[in-house]
């Protein structure tokens, strides 16, 4: 459930929106001691959902800076997290900056209105869009020279790209995803290594956060929806591997996936079907249409398409067959302090990078 930590930040500019999303050290310590208690790992993979962060900038009241101001704020955020884990836990961080570029075509293929509200906002905000293109281009170039900081982008949900990146890792190191997107909640459920999502936000000078893991993903989703305890109790025996199917049968308004059925009825349908052994209490592929038809016999085709649009496993399979996945140009780790210093002087004179703590 949500935890609170007092603090202050009120976004006024694009870069201040990034700064406002830094998780302070007191809160990081609380999260780390709770989520990774007893871990002997010496490396932590940190995934930062830039798309979810940057979408907050497409508002008329946000002032924009220069072509590197947001890039500097993001890199300093990475340094902020790296310095914390190095100083207090002796743990090295590999940091992945995940960004969705353009429309999410593989989601739209099955649900044409997918994420159209966010896309329209970006298309109408020409000045902010140009500003962000400049900043992300500089950020992408800079990451090549920063030790173990990577910039990955593509026309896919960041949760899909994160899930795929975790699948490719072979060292069993734990993963922490920093994002306010509920779609990320499915990643810990299917990850082979310990993975958590930190969903945090500032509300009236307080930081509120929830820690999502492979066991509580559905419970935390319903808590985020601010549903009653009685409704939440209905999901306690439902395997979180049904997360994607549950979302397809309900809603995700941030991606314009509008209501198919209400939450309480959906949970009743799930529990009934599981208890009668009509469906397994485990992951069901969207390809199993006969089984899915038992949940919505009059709207099976619509449900299957919605499910294909939001299901993490299905979308990850599509991503891993794409040219975006095959393109490994992001996987560059030149570790060139002189080049970092040169780029800092060239692009970040007004917004310097804290290079001494990299």
Task: Describe each PLM feature range.
Residues 7-13, 35-45, 83, 87-96, ...:
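Non-catalytic nucleic-acid-binding/docking modules located in mid-to-C-terminal regions
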Residues 177-179:
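Conserved RecA-like ASCE P-loop NTPase motor core of nucleic-acid helicases/translocases
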Residues 10-173, 190-203:
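Noncatalytic, basic helical substrate-engagement surface that gates or grips nucleic-acid strands
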């Amino acid at each position: 459930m949500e935890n609170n930590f007092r603090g202050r930040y009120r976004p006024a500019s694009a870069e201040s929106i990034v700064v406002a999303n830094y998780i302070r050290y007191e809160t990081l310590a609380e999260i780390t001691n709770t989520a990774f208690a007893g871990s002997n790992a010496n490396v932590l993979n940190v995934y930062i959902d830039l798309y979810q962060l940057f979408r907050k900038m497409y508002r008329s009241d946000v002032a924009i800076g220069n072509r590197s101001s947001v890039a500097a704020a993001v890199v300093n955020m990475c340094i902020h997290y790296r310095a914390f884990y190095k100083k207090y836990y002796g743990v090295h961080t590999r940091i992945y900056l995940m960004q969705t570029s353009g429309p999410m075509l593989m989601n739209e293929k099955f649900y044409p209105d997918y994420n159209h509200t966010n896309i329209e906002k970006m298309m109408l905000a020409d000045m902010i869009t140009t500003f962000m293109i400049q900043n992300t281009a500089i950020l992408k170039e800079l990451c090549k020279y920063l030790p173990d900081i990577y910039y990955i982008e593509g026309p896919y949900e960041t949760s899909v790209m994160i899930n795929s990146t975790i699948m490719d890792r072979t060292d069993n190191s734990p993963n922490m995803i920093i994002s306010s997107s509920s779609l990320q909640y499915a990643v810990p459920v299917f990850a082979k290594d310990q993975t958590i999502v930190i969903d945090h936000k500032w509300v009236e000078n307080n930081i509120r956060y929830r820690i999502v893991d492979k066991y509580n993903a559905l419970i935390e989703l319903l808590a985020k929806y601010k549903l009653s305890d009685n409704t939440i109790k209905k999901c306690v025996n439902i395997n979180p591997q049904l997360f994607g199917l549950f979302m397809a049968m309900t809603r995700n308004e941030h991606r314009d996936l509008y209501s198919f059925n209400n939450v309480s009825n959906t949970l009743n349908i799930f529990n009934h079907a599981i208890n009668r052994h009509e469906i397994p209490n485990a992951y069901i592929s969207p390809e199993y249409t006969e089984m899915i038809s038992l949940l919505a016999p009059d709207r099976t085709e619509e449900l299957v398409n919605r499910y294909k649009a939001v299901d993490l496993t299905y979308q990850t399979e599509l991503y891993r067959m794409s040219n975006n996945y095959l393109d490994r140009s992001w996987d560059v780790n030149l570790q060139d302090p002189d080049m970092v210093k040169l780029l800092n002087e060239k692009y970040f004179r007004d917004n310097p990078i804290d290079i001494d703590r990299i």
